[in-house]
């Protein structure tokens, strides 16, 4: 999972100064930071707050999901995408993974007081069970782009579009049938654990290059 922390600026809460953690580039990784990461991965979960990235908090257990072939936590997903958007200065709204997963699962009760974002594009990391998929909403074009790292978009497409239309109706939007869902060509996940990492790279590629074939 080293790729996840590339250019990911973590802000430690304890005695450590702010630093850019670039684990994918080992020559640039200082020995001090290397020891810090290794010590964190070996330790037991304590619930300690380790880093703050924008509005997102990363705990020791969050960063431990970066180790080996573990599934990425929602805090890591949200924090990384926040940095991607912030770094590129795209006019994009990040719908945090908890809210996005509730919305596209049709669980609207917790969304009644949600403030409708002003940005035209929404980046939505969605977790169904133990699998991450990426939904990108284009408000003005009335289009949804669905990317499943496994390449099984057909499993989710009707559910995603149906729940999005229902969400809009709940918010008072009447002309929801104009909305369409699209997919795009991309390479597929080859294992059982890298869906979160691929979601992050797909999102980063899309923001950089638009609707071209996504490859990793």
Question: Which residues does each PLM region occupy?
Answer:
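Cysteine protease-like catalytic core of ubiquitin/ubiquitin-like
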Residues: 97-216
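Cysteine protease catalytic domains with a Cys-His-Asp triad
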Residues: 1-133, 137-144, 149, 153
């Amino acid at each position: 999972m080293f790729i996840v922390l590339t250019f990911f600026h973590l802000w430690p809460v304890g005695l450590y100064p702010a630093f850019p953690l670039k684990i994918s580039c080992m020559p640039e990784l200082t020995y001090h930071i290397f020891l810090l990461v290794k010590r964190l991965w070996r330790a037991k979960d304590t619930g300690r707050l380790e880093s703050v990235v924008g509005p997102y908090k990363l705990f020791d257990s969050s960063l431990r999901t970066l180790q080996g072939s573990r599934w990425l936590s929602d805090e890591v997903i949200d924090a990384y995408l926040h940095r991607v958007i912030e770094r590129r200065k795209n006019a994009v709204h990040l719908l945090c993974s908890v809210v996005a997963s509730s919305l596209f699962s049709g669980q609207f009760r917790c969304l009644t007081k949600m403030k409708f974002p002003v940005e035209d594009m929404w980046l939505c990391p969605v977790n169904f069970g133990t699998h991450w998929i990426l939904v990108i909403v284009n408000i003005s074009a009335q289009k949804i782009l669905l990317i499943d790292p496994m390449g099984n978009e057909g499993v989710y497409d009707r559910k995603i579009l149906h729940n999005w239309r229902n969400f809009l109706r709940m918010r008072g939007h009447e002309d929801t049938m104009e909305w369409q869902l699209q997919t795009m060509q991309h390479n597929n996940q080859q294992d059982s654990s890298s869906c979160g990492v691929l979601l992050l790279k797909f999102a980063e590629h899309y923001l950089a290059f638009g609707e071209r074939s996504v490859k990793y």
